[in-house]
Amino acid sequence: MLIAYDGTERAGRALEYAAQLLRPTTVEILTAWEPVARQTARAVSRTGIHQSTVSPDGVEEDPAYEEALKICRQGIELAESLGLAGRAHLVESATTISSAIIDAAHELDVDVIVTGTRALTGFRAWWTNSTADQIVRNAGLPVF
């Protein structure tokens, strides 16, 4: 079982429900992250401003990596508090977070993906990109 954990209350609730209802013994806790340099380049490219090519020397120096590591550790702590053995995975997102989660699920050969959702409906859901929705549509695996 792969738990897509981003540190939100929704992700924590999804982990708690999965522990109660699916009763796994071991879970793969996955936190997907995007380097700050890539986030900045994507944001700046929309404005037409010249993009800098400066990037940190190593992953460990990237503040986004440090934050993702902290979040993943919180997921492991939550899993252990629920009586589960958790294995931590950090995945750098090259395209979208949903693609990173799906690729990791296939690589880890899990049988189900657990993810939280914002449960948007109506007009807001139509205009808002949903990671959970993309996972459901493209994973080829059960999603809880």
Language model regions located:
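Structural beta-alpha unit
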Residues: 70, 77-113
